[in-house]
Amino acid sequence: MWMYSGRTPADEKQQYAESVVKAGVVAAMFWGVAGMLVGVIIALQLSFPHLFYFPDLAWTNFGRMRPLHTSAVIFAFGGNVLIATSFYVVQRTCRARLWGGSLSWLVFWGYNIFILLAGTGYLIGVTEGREYAEPEWYADIWLTIVWVCYLLTFLGTLWKRKEPHIYVANWFYLAFIVTIAVLHLVNNLSMPVSFLETKSYSLFSGVQDALTQWWYGHNAVGFFLTAGFLGIMYYFIPKRAERPVYSYRLSIIHFWSLIFIYIWAGPHHLLYTALPEWAQTLGMTFSIILWMPSWGGMINGLMTLSGAWDKLRTDPVLRMLVVSVAFYGMATFEGPAMSIKAVNALSHYTNWTVGHVHSGALGWVGYVSFGAIYCLVPWLWKRKLYSNALVEWHFWLSTLGIVLYITSMWVAGIMQGLMWRAYNEFGFLEYAFSEVVQAQHPYYIIRALGGLLYLGGTLVMVFNLWKTVKGGEVMPAASSAPVLAAEAAE
C-alpha cells in the first residue's frame, strides 16, 4: 500500500525543475482572473444588453466574447494549472528532475502562445465555430507541436524515475495528455482555404461532423476537465490531509472504468437530432454506466480524510479541496441523469445545461485548482501562506457565488424547458419566444451576481498569494512537504 515517508537530507539536495512550475502557477492565476472577468462581462450583457453594446466594436460582441471566456477559463487557466501541477507531481512521485532540460519551458511558453493565437483570433472573428475547438488551423498545428513536447517531457520523466511504482496521479495525467492529443488531431482535421489565409473547412460534414465534434467536446470535458484534475485530487488531498489514498484498488477501478467508458458517451449531446437512434442510445447507456466509477472516485477522495476530518475546521485549503470532490460527485450524478432521453427532452438547449456545466467548472475544476495552488505557492516559494483568514473569505465568497449561479440557472432552465413545451387548448404554443426570454431576466441578474462573487473570491486569492510571495514568513527547511513513497505492496 502507499504510505508517507519523510524527506531525507539527500532528497532535500536533489534539484527539481521548479521555475517552470512557478511560471505555470502565475500564468494560471493571470488567465483565471482574465477569463472570469470576461465571463462576468458576458453575464451582464445577457442581463443588460445595452450595458456593453458598442456597435462599432465588433470584438465586444457576445458572440466573440463567449468563446474567449470559455477558452480562457478552460484552456488558459485550466491548462496552465494542469501543466504546472503535472510537472510538480511527476517529479516528486518519481524522485526525478523533468526530462528534456529546457523542453519544459518550450511547453510552457508554447502553450501560452497558443492561448494568445486562439484568443486574438476569436476577437477578430477568426474561428472554426466548433465549441471548445474554435482555434483555426494555424493555432491547431502549433498546439500539436507543443503537446508532443509535453507528452515527451512527461513520459521521459516517468522513464527515468527512481521510484519503482508509478503513482496513481500520474496515470490520470498521462491519460489526459494522450487522449487530448488523439481528440485534438481527429476533430481538427481540416483543409485551409490557402496557407496564406486563416479560414479552413472541416474534412467532416453533416451528422458525421456533429458526431466528431461532440465526441471531442464531451471527452475534452472527460479527459481535460476530469482525468487531469483527478490527478490533482489523488496527489494534493492525501498530501494536505497527511493520509494515504483510501483505497488504491478503488483508484485502479476508477481509472480503467473512466478510460473505457467515458470515450463512448459523446452522443448524449446529440439526443433528438439527426444522429442515428442506436448511436443516441449508446451514448445514453454509457453515460448512465459512467455514474458508478465517477462516484467510486468521489468516495475514494472523500474517504482519504478518514481519521483527519477534524482538519476541515482548521484548514480552509483542505476544505476547498474536499468540497471540490463533493461538486465532482454532484456533477457526475447530474450529467448521467441529464443524458436520459426523458430528462434531456426538458433540459436540452436550456440554461439547466449551463448550470450543470458551471457546477462542475466552478465547484470541481475551480476549487481543486485553487486548493492545489494554495499548496504549491508556499512549497515553491518556501514561505508560509500569508493569511488563512483570507482563504476563508475566498472560500465563502466563491461558495455563495456558485450557489447563486447554479441554482438560478437550474430554476431558469427548468422553467425555460417547461415554457417551450407548453400548449394551449388549441394546440398552439402557449408562450412566444420573447416571453420565455423575458421570464429569464431575473435569473440572469442572479447569475451575474454569482459570477461577480466568484471573481471577487479569486481576487482575494490573488492578493493573498501576492503577499505570500512578497512578504510571507520564510518556512524552515524541515517543514517541506513529505514525498509519497511506496513502502510495501500488499
Q: Residues of each region from the PLM?
A:
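Cytosolic juxtamembrane amphipathic/interface segments immediately preceding
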Residues: 9-23
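Hydrophobic cores of alpha-helical transmembrane segments in multi-pass integral membrane proteins
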Residues: 2-4, 22-126, 137-158, 170-195, ...
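Membrane-interface helix termini and inter-helical loops of multi-pass transporters
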Residues: 128-131, 273-276, 345-348
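Long amphipathic alpha-helical scaffold segments
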Residues: 2-6, 15, 311
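Surface-exposed loop and adjacent secondary-structure segments within mature catalytic domains
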Residues: 135, 197-205
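Short, highly charged, low-complexity non-transmembrane loops/tails of multi-pass membrane proteins
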Residues: 473-490
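Active-site-proximal inter-transmembrane loops
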Residues: 203-212, 347, 352-354
